[in-house]
Amino acid sequence: MHILLSISGHERAGIVRDVAESLLNIHANIEDSSMTALRGRFTMMLIVNLDANSSFGELKASLAELEQRTGLTVQSQQLSEDEVNHVPLEPDCVITVSGADKPGIVHAVSDVLAGLDVSIVDVSTQSRESEQGNMYMMALEAVSGEHMDAMQQALAKASKELGVDIQVHALESSIL
């Protein structure tokens, strides 16, 4: 049985250890994960596999104890067989965006990509203060497929309209 876990809490040393220990205690294997710190909060998304001797109820009880002991917030969802067997998309490009922070950057870039049927696989954004004001940085991993040229042209137009720098970097399949 595969379970999707979303876990968050105040950033501190030992969160990954605490979560991994709770999962190990019920023989759950962490198969896929993404973890990051965001402005004092630590967030984790994990797909775990329970062995045949563990139940979803045991997992829920272990996670409730983890929440009580650590103050973390945990959500869990059982995955369907189709979700478990889904083959993830492999990105073929990285898109970087940088410039003055303002509302609408994420929407404009994602709107261009969605309009070309380009799938976003991963996104990371940061807004930071600098001597020039708030600066915005975004990196997206995407699957452009046959739309690389059209995507580059549309993003160049969006770059001018937004007043930000947008670069597209093709990934070689051998480094994926």
Model-identified regions with their sequence ranges:
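A conserved regulatory-domain signal marking ACT and ACT-like small-molecule sensing domains
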Residues: M1-L176
